[in-house]
Amino acid sequence: IFQEDDIMLAVSYVLFIAQEQQMPLSICIGLGTSMGAHQGEGPLNEYINSIAAFTQNAVSVPAGNEGTARHHYLREFGPNDTEDTVELRVGDRESTRGFMTEFWGDSPGSYYMTIQSPTGEKLSVSTALKNRTQELSFVFVETKVLVNYVPIERRTGNTLIFIRFLHPAVGIWKFLVGERIPGESRFHMWLPVRGMISDDTYFLEPSPEYTVTSPGDAADAMTVTAYQYRDNSLYVQASRGYNTENVVKPDFAAPGVDILTASIGAGAEFAPATGTSLAA
């Protein structure tokens, strides 16, 4: 796990060395996160775009392995359709560790949310406490939910609801989502990437689209997905585009299934590995 500014510092260092040596530079950032609006926004994405604007620099990043993870939910509202129920299954591991999820509603919009526990208890998220942390305490399941409601997120202009679960009860949690302004709009919800959350926590009606991780959604990064070089089939778990601004991502595919690489474990020096980071 790396902070975004740590990655930016590392990139800045190798960029300085390349300029000092007057050499072209190729950077591979084999990491990704599913947090954010997936518009290609954010300090790291903007930094990558600024570097990739120069022809002597190339930045390759993985698309991610979220295609079949069931970590993304998408709903599009029509003119007469303003409410939806999002169902999320919470597993045993998260009941002790907790987890987080993000809601992003397209602007212009005025979204509201009620959270329902597996026992049926409902608590509403206040839209009045803007940018402040709300604590929702469920009585029958002894769960606390910390919520930050941001009506206009400063980089995107979209509505962000940041939700953190503390000791969530195992079972089906529901998010009752509504839109006060009739018309066409949509919202997304994303869970953390594989490895940061167990496979037992997922949306019951997921969407595999818009699952390219950040910084893979950056406009000028070379975003790489993976395929099986033996039969030219795409890697089924690879994340899928576009980004939410409809920029085409990933940009291309490279071999990334059962690639022989150096082993970090005991025993063999080399072992097969799979993923879009290897493809990048």
Set out the residue ranges of the language-model regions.
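Loop-rich non-cytosolic ectodomains and luminal regions
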Residues: 1-280
